């Protein structure tokens, strides 16, 4: 989406085709170029110009010679037109001179280059017509750039109404991200390329006949099929008798004949790794490696390659595109516009009552007569009965069309019952259309898009019933009637509209994809049309099919390999790079664009998300109100509450009916603390040994208190419950926020983001306090009034939102309370409620014992009693794992795993019923599960209890698995016939691994995530089934019976298809041997058979649907295409291409989009706004952030400091990174003992090792050993370097294969350190690692599901005969091989062929009636359900969950300097400042150091004390309040900064927002109190200073009062103090106090704070006070009690104030003093002599 470069004179001299309808100039001589039709003509000609390029090939001219002159004529006309345009542009703009000259404009240069290419092509064609240049010569490659002229036709649509800088920034950012991910992909390709070279090397050893001689290797010399082997006897495959294992390269075969795939050197290895990572052909490489090398090595390499490269790294591309598209969506909303209404008719609607009394939403003018039909017909047409009748007829038509099938060659097809039915339906729908036109009028009818579609179907089907057009391409109109059935389901209709949204987005993407295919096909056509022995690019249709095949990834390796073999060894690398780049763009970026568009369509508008959040919260509250149906059933029975029963009571007394639950309020609740009241009272007489009265009295008092408390709790419960619940919620939210502690950052700007957000908060506070009185001052202008009004409205909206949040919280609490009350009422009124099996009592000892056993779990977590935060212990991760489930569940997990391991040893030849050792695990599992279920049933009940065992699907599955295992163990059938009930029981027994889903909570969460999105997945499945049904019906009507052919390619007619013929055998797919003169390929004689293709046919809808389902998975569609083209006609190849395009580009990406959307919805991110999602990403990102493990620079400038500067210099780090890469290049060839190249390579590696030893030594010297050890990266480098030193020693000592292998491993380990040295690689590697961590349980779930299918596959297909893909590598003979086959199916590698091999039926196999293990037949129905269900669940759903997790985690790391929140630079700056303050590198600092940390921050985190002094105090006080003056961690300060850097109103959600605002309000109030207190002190000091200068009488009275008081307290010693002594006393007093200024909290001072006085720097010029003015002289013996001294000082001050107030003639001053006195008295704190500036200025 590039916008062209605008010149500075665009307005004066715009250029043609540079914008919609722009004009160049008003000059008459170039007036023609300004015409709009000229613009359109030039764009049309740009498209037409591609046509001659596509026809200009030697093969096309050979078949159609006149086309040579047609292309020449077209090129000549286009050449003159574009040349004239170019001259006109040059005339207007100038060629070189001027700011907007021709050569200075990019698009003008592009247009000129296209004209030059057009001239070159025309001259070349003249030479070809004159036979001067051969048509098959490479000169034709000069036409390669010509197809790019199509850009001229579409660049007009790349013009957007957005600022150019914004578009540039978006494209630059997305380009950087794609480049970064490409580097990340290249890193993994290089890594696996190096590993492949060192682990495998060459695959050149094959089994050949014993008499094979060098230079004489032919097809008949190889084994059938061609088999790789190992020359080592202990590993790999050993050739059968009559063959020997030989290196074909030594026998004379060239590299081109051996094939280009392999691990010979690093280049070929990377090429092979990329092929394997595309999941195309990788399994055959693995089989070759298994035959040539140890089995474990092949499995490890290829399975990890698929997992990391194909599933994780490549999916990061999807994440990049989705994130970029989400950002672009907001910017380009203006271009795409908002979604229009579903109908294009009237937008104004109203409710209308229909005939049945219901209400319908119809257009306002629907009742107005629009056509000429009578009113009764119009009413009938609008009725729902007519609508449903038409839809039912469409349904019948679809069923009839789907019932069509092939009836044989001799059956007359033209006028059968299906044709007659089609005529009848066509007439019916024609009448429907005519009726609607009559009722609505043609204008009213055609105005609806739905009616346009119906009219198109009517016209097409009417033509279709014409006999000559029946079973032609017009059949599309008949089968498209099924699309009308979408109107039946409003949910499906809404989903379709939501998915496809405005057609502009998806339509533009489809047009872009088609244009890309045409351009790339034309380029490839001109690049390879002259290559001999290559028929894939001889004509444009063949080139288009080849490039489309690469786009779908099916067989793209075959296309590339054939081209590589044809172009030769010299050009092969360039051709391979060309195809890989095209494949990379088409499969990763282009398909990701489709996923991004669908996700964008599923995305809600921002203004609806918060409303949806509120509605969802309300819905959750409503659902929590109701009890489950299994408990509500008790409400149907009459109430029978339990009454109090007294066993020993005289019959004369009648006991009133008192509920037992009421009495338990007073009795049962105290049983754990004291004895029962009725037992204690009579026991007092007997317990009077030592003190007969005291125990009794104390016990009675205790009981009385308990009774009072219980009664009080009952009475006060309703009053306090709600307030307590709200407080608990707020505390829980605050605690959760404290524990989560992580958040975000961003680039430097002129103003700090902390300051910006602080002022936003202050504005809201002022609005909050000013909203009560709406007084307007007279001097305000109109603009100010308007602004104030908007602010007030905004505040009222926020206030209303607060009230909604609080209402929802109250509703949730009330729902929970109501649910509890309902449970309590049922428990009280129904004796059998909450009684397991209606037998065991609720509080029975046995049940309590079972509860203790069932719920016992490990819990070693310690919580802080103050904050409630969980303290992390040393092994907290291990403790968390142990406490994940209960002890009983741990036992059952272990037993289940052991039982599954035992099942893995079962096979058709080692069955559990005949192997006693395998029965042990079976008995153990059933016994343990019996004990477990009995304990859980006795503890929690079976079904009718609140916590029953069967309360969800997991409980049902547990009981089902247990019953199946128990029945099988009791039965243990000895003979199991195929397709019998016993075999079905064995298949159901294979569901045993699913027990772990129920036992592990995280696994249950995975299942919930899968099934919660079942509705959307079901709707997508319906859409794909509809698409398949449309194309299947079409295929049956066109291809039924036409795909059958004789297996002898020389026979055309069916009558001649008899006898036998010799068929060639395919020996190898990899070797490219040529037949020698007189040589024949291996083959054998077979009978001729007229039959359909083996894997598919279109004889009925069922087979057609199965074939299209396989094609939908993009497997096998190339064979379907080739068969249809070869047997029906080339024109019908369009059919399969259209279906594959719709299925691949839209159908499969629908699954990806829906699964990602459902995952986001389950994670709670689907309804988050952009700001809220960024905030969640920020919190997750900061959780991972850690302090820099970098020691400080040495203080002096000595040797260590210089070494530190050297090791931290960027040049040093880059040099080390280059050295690591250079050492990795040494592994470009395999290190083999026998290869002479290995010795110099290993010697160079030794030199590199010593360099890295020097690097580690320098770092240890610079940082000190302790500082060096702080960094994990340094530890890893030290480990690898140590291993390198050990290898050097062993290498020179032993010099064998093991030392070479160790040296290669050390280099590979060193290669991993590149990620830590590159920021982008580190970020993306973190994405993959975190994705692996978060998807651990999804991966485990996939494996468990795969294990279940593997066990079932062994039972169903363990003895199936070998076929095309079932062979010695891929079969179900054991669980291990079945797992390998299923992992191959997960990647989609020929899964359909394996399924057809498992469907083999007699007479192609040998059945057995008694045992399934004695037959080699398959199971048709079983294979169909088995493979299709497995592929859908794993490939379409589970793998897409991995994509969703990667997308989520990539957005977590998707941060650049344009982010509105904290960026990586901000975070890095904070880490550096933290290291400066945390000098001990402990990760925590004292609270008083936070203010120094905040003062050191710069950039966007800077706090300017001149402007934001109050913000600074708020931040300091927040740390002190949350941590009580203790130590704060790195994440605590980062959390506080992140909260202060965002707009909490936009970023935070409901409960978190309430808790945060409550905290900030509290902080504001406390800091305001402190500020007022300091301000008052300062004012009083100034008042006293003025009083000292003006009132000398006051001084004399004060001195006399001092003398009287001193005489009263200490008569003997009265001395007069001097000013000099005053200063000394102040200093002494100051020295006696601790320096608590830095640690002083901003709360109200307490008695423990010893107030001090010190000389203020700001008051140096003021009169100095004397001690007698403020404080009584101290006594000879100091007062030890602090409280008395405080009271004395306080009393002295109040006395002096009273004197001042009496003598002061000003009444305001006196009232001020009295108010201050009262305020001080209320505070009860010590007043210090410090001013407010002392606390504000740190």
From Swiss-Prot:
Tissue distribution: Predominantly expressed in the brain, moderately in the heart and weakly in the pancreas.
Extracellular side: 58-65, 130-137, 200-269, 290-294, 404-416, 469-472, 531-543, 564-569, 907-915, 973-980, 1040-1104, 1125-1129, 1228-1236, 1294-1296, 1358-1378, 1399-1420
Region (Disordered): 762-789, 1611-1679
Polar residues composition bias: residue spans: 1613-1631
Sequence ranges marked intramembrane in UniProt: 270-289, 544-563, 1105-1124, 1379-1398
Stored Pfam families: Ion_trans
Highest taxon of source: Eukaryota
Stretches with biased composition (Low complexity): 1633-1648
Cystine connections: 207-239, 229-245, 1046-1057, 1405-1417
Known regulation of activity: Inhibited by low micromolar concentrations of Gd(3+) and high micromolar concentrations of verapamil. Insensitive to tetrodotoxin (TTX) and potentiated by low external Ca(2+) concentration.
Bilayer disposition of the protein: Multi-pass membrane protein
Recorded catalytic activity of this chain's protein: Na(+)(in) = Na(+)(out)
All ranges on the Cytoplasmic side of the membrane: 1-36, 91-106, 159-173, 323-382, 440-447, 493-502, 600-886, 940-947, 1004-1015, 1160-1210, 1261-1271, 1319-1331, 1448-1738
UniProt keyword list: Cell membrane, Coiled coil, Disulfide bond, Glycoprotein, Ion channel, Ion transport, Membrane, Phosphoprotein, Repeat, Sodium, Sodium channel, Sodium transport, Transmembrane, Transmembrane helix, Transport, Voltage-gated channel
One GO BP annotation of this record: regulation of resting membrane potential
Keyword Transport among UniProt keywords: yes
Entry PTM: Phosphorylated on tyrosine residues.
One GO cellular component, as annotated: monoatomic ion channel complex
Coiled coil segments of this chain: 795-830
Glycosites: 210, 216, 1064
Protein family: Belongs to the NALCN family.
Assembly: Found in a complex with NALCN, UNC79, UNC80 and NACL1; these auxiliary subunits are indispensable for the function of NALCN channel. Interacts with UNC80; required for the NALCN activation/inhibition by GPCRs in neurons. Found in a complex with NALCN, UNC79 and UNC80; UNC80 bridges NALCN to UNC79. Interacts with CHRM3.
PANTHER family (alphabetical): SODIUM LEAK CHANNEL NALCN, SODIUM LEAK CHANNEL NON-SELECTIVE PROTEIN
Annotated protein name in UniProt: Sodium leak channel NALCN
Encoding gene per record: Nalcn
């Amino acid at each position: 989406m590039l916008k062209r470069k605008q010149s500075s004179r665009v307005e004066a001299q715009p250029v043609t085709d540079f914008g919609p309808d722009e004009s160049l100039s008003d000059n008459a001589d170039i007036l023609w170029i300004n015409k709009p039709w000229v613009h359109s003509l030039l764009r049309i000609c740009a498209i037409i110009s591609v046509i001659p390029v596509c026809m200009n090939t030697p093969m096309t001219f050979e078949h159609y010679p006149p086309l040579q002159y047609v292309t020449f004529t077209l090129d000549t006309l286009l050449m003159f037109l574009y040349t004239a345009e170019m001259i006109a542009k040059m005339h207007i703009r100038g060629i070189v001179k001027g700011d907007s000259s021709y050569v200075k404009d990019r698009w003008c240069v592009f247009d000129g280059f296209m004209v030059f290419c057009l001239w070159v092509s025309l001259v070349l064609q003249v030479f070809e017509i004159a036979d001067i240049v051969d048509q098959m010569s490479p000169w034709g490659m000069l036409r390669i750039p010509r197809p790019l002229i199509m850009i001229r036709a579409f660049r007009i649509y790349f013009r957007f109404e957005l600022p150019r800088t914004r578009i540039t920034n978006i494209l630059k950012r997305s380009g950087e991200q794609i480049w970064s991910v490409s580097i990340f992909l290249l890193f993994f390709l290089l890594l696996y390329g190096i590993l492949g070279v060192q682990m495998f090397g060459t695959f050149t050893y094959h089994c050949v006949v014993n008499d094979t001689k060098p230079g004489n290797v032919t097809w008949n010399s190889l084994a059938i099929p061609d088999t790789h082997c190992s020359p080592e006897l202990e590993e790999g495959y050993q050739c059968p008798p009559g063959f020997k294992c030989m290196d074909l390269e030594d026998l004379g075969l060239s590299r081109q004949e051996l094939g280009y795939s392999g691990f010979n050197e690093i280049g070929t290895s990377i090429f092979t790794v990329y092929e394997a990572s595309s999941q195309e052909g990788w399994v055959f490489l693995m089989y070759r490696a298994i035959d040539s090398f140890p089995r474990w090595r092949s499995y490890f390499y290829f399975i990890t390659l698929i997992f990391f490269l194909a599933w994780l790294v490549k999916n990061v591309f999807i994440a990049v595109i989705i994130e970029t598209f989400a950002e672009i969506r907001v910017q380009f909303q203006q271009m795409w516009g908002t979604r229009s209404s579903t109908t294009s008719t009237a937008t104004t609607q109203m409710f209308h009552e229909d005939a049945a009394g219901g209400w319908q939403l119809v257009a306002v003018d629907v009742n107005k007569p629009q056509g000429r039909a009578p009113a009764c017909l119009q009413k009938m047409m609008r009725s729902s009965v007519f609508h449903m009748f038409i839809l039912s007829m469409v349904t019948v038509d679809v069923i009839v069309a789907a019932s069509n099938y092939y009836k044989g060659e001799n059956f007359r097809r033209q006028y059968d019952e299906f044709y007659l039915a089609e005529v009848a339906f066509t007439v019916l729908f024609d009448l429907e259309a005519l009726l609607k036109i009559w009722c609505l009028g043609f204008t009213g009818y055609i105005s609806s898009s739905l009616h346009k579609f119906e009219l198109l179907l009517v016209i097409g089907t009417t033509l279709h019933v014409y006999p000559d057009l029946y079973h032609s391409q017009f059949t599309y109109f008949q089968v498209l009637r099924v699309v009308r059935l979408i109107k039946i389901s409003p949910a499906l209709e809404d989903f379709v509209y939501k998915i496809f949204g405005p057609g502009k987005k998806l339509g533009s993407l489809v047009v872009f994809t088609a244009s890309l295919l045409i351009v790339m096909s034309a380029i490839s056509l001109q690049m390879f049309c002259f290559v001999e022995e290559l028929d894939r690019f001889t004509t444009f249709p063949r080139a288009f099919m080849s490039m489309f095949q690469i786009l779908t990834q099916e067989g793209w390796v075959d296309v590339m390999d054939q081209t590589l073999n044809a172009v030769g060894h010299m050009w092969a690398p360039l051709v391979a790079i060309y195809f890989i780049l095209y494949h990379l763009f088409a499969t990763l970026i282009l398909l990701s664009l489709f996923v991004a568009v669908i996700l964008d369509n599923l995305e809600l508008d921002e203004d609806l998300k918060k409303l949806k959040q509120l509605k969802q919260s309300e819905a959750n509250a409503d659902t929590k109100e109701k009890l489950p149906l299994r408990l509500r059933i008790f409400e149907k029975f009459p109430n029978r509450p339990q009454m109090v029963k007294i066993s020993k009571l005289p019959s004369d007394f009648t006991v009133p009916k008192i509920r037992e639950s009421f009495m338990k309020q007073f009795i049962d609740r105290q049983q754990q603390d004291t004895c029962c009241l009725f037992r204690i009272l009579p026991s007092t007489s007997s317990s009077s040994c030592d003190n007969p009265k005291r125990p009794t009295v104390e016990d009675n008092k205790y009981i009385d208190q308990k009774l009072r408390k219980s009664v009080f709790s009952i009475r006060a419960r309703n009053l306090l419950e709600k307030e307590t619940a709200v407080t608990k919620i707020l505390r829980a939210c605050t605690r959760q926020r404290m524990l989560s502690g992580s958040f975000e950052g961003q680039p430097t700007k002129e103003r700090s983001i902390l300051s910006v957000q602080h002022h936003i908060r202050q504005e809201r506070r002022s609005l909050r306090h000013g909203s009560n009185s709406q007084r307007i001052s007279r001097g305000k202008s109109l603009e100010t009034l308007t602004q104030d009004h908007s602010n007030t409205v905004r505040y009222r909206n926020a206030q209303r939102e607060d009230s909604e949040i609080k209402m929802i919280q109250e509703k949730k609490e009330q729902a929970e309370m109501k649910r509890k009350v309902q449970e309590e009422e049922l428990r009280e009124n129904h004796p059998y409620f909450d009684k397991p099996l209606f037998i065991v009592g609720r509080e029975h000892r046995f049940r309590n014992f079972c509860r203790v056993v069932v719920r016992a779990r490990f819990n070693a977590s310690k919580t802080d009693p103050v904050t409630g935060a969980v303290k992390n212990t040393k092994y907290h991760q291990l403790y968390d794992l142990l406490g994940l489930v209960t002890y009983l569940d741990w036992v059952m997990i272990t037993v289940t795993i052991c039982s599954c391991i035992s099942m893995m040893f079962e096979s058709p030849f080692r069955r559990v019923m005949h192997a006693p050792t395998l029965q042990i695990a079976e008995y153990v599992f059933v016994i343990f599960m019996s004990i477990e279920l009995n304990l859980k049933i006795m503890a929690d009940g079976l079904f009718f209890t609140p916590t029953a065992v069967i309360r969800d699907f997991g409980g049902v599955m547990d009981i089902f698995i247990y019953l199946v295992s128990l029945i099988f163990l009791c039965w243990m059938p000895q003979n199991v016939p195929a397709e019998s009930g016993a075999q079905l029981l064995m298949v159901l027994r294979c569901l045993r691994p699913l027990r772990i889903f129920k036992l592990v909570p995280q696994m249950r969460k995975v299942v919930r995530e899968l099934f919660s999105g079942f509705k959307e997945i079901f709707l997508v499945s319906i859409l794909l089934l509809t698409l398949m049904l449309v194309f299947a019906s079409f295929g049956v009507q066109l291809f039924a019976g036409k795909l059958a052919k004789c297996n002898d390619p020389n026979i055309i007619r069916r009558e001649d298809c008899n006898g036998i013929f010799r068929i060639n055998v395919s020996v190898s797919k990899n070797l490219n041997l040529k037949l020698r003169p007189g040589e024949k390929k291996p083959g054998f004689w077979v009978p001729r058979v007229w039959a359909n293709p083996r894997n598919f046919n279109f004889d009925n809808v069922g087979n057609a649907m199965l074939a299209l389902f396989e094609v939908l998975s993009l497997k096998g569609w190339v064979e379907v295409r080739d068969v249809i083209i070869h047997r029906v006609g080339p024109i019908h190849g369009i059919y399969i291409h259209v279906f594959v395009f719709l299925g691949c580009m839209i159908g499969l990406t629908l699954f990806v989009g829906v699964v990602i959307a459902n995952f986001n919805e389950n994670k709670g991110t689907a309804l988050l706004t952009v700001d809220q999602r960024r905030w969640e990403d920020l919190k997750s990102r900061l959780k991972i952030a850690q302090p820099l493990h970098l020691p400080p620079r040495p203080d002096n400038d000595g040797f260590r400091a210089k070494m530190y500067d050297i090791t931290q210099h960027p040049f040093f780090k880059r040099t080390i990174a280059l050295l690591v890469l250079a050492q990795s290049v040494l592994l470009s060839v395999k290190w083999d003992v026998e290869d002479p190249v290995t010795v110099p390579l290993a010697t160079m590696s030794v030199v590199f090792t010593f360099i890295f030893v020097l690097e580690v030594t320098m770092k240890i010297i610079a940082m000190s050993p302790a500082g060096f050890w702080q960094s994990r990266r340094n530890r890893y480098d030290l480990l690898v370097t140590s291993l390198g030193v050990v290898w050097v020693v062993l290498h020179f000592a032993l010099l064998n294969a093991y030392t070479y292998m160790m040296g290669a491993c050390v280099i590979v380990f060193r290669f991993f350190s590149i990620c830590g040295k590159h920021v982008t690689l580190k970020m993306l590697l973190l994405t993959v690692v975190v994705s692996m961590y978060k998807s651990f349980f999804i991966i485990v779930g996939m494996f468990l599901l795969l294990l279940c299918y593997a066990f079932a596959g062994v039972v169903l297909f363990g003895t199936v005969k070998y076929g095309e893909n079932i062979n010695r590598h891929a079969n179900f003979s054991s669980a291990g091989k079945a797992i390998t086959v299923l992992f191959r199916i997960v990647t989609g590698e020929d899964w359909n062929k394996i399924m057809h091999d498992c469907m083999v039926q007699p007479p192609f196999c040998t059945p057995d009636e008694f045992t399934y293990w004695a037959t080699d037949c398959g199971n048709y129905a079983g294979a169909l359900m088995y493979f299709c269900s497995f592929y859908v669940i794993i490939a379409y759903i589970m793998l897409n969950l991995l994509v969703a997790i990667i997308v989520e985690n990539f957005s977590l790391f998707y941060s650049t300097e344009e982010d509105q929140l904290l960026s990586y630079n901000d975070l890095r700056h904070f880490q550096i400042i933290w290291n400066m303050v945390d000098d001990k590198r402990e990760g925590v600092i004292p609270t008083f150091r936070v203010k120094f940390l905040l003062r050191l921050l710069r950039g966007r985190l800077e706090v300017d004390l001149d402007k934001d002094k109050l913000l600074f105090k708020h931040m300091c006080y927040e740390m002190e309040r949350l941590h009580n003056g203790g130590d704060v961690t790195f994440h605590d300060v980062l959390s506080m900064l992140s909260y202060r850097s965002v707009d909490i109103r936009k970023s935070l959600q409901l409960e978190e927002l309430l808790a945060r605002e409550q905290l900030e309000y509290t902080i504001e109030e406390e800091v305001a109190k402190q500020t007022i207190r300091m301000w008052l002190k300062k004012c009083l000091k100034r008042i006293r200073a003025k009083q000292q200068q003006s009132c000398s009488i006051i001084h004399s009275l004060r001195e006399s009062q001092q003398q009287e008081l001193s005489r009263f307290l200490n008569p003997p010693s009265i001395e007069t103090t001097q000013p000099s002594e005053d200063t000394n006393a102040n200093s002494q007093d100051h020295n006696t106090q601790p320096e608590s200024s830095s640690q002083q909290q901003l709360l109200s001072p307490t008695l423990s704070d010893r107030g001090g006085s010190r000389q203020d720097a700001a008051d140096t010029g003021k009169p100095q006070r004397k001690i007698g003015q403020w404080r009584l002289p101290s006594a000879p013996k100091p007062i030890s009690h602090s409280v008395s001294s405080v009271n004395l000082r306080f009393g002295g001050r109040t006395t002096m104030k009273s004197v001042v107030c009496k003598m002061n003639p000003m009444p305001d001053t006196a009232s001020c003093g009295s108010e201050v006195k009262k305020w001080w008295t209320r505070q009860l704190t010590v007043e210090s002599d410090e001013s407010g500036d002392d606390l504000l200025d740190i």
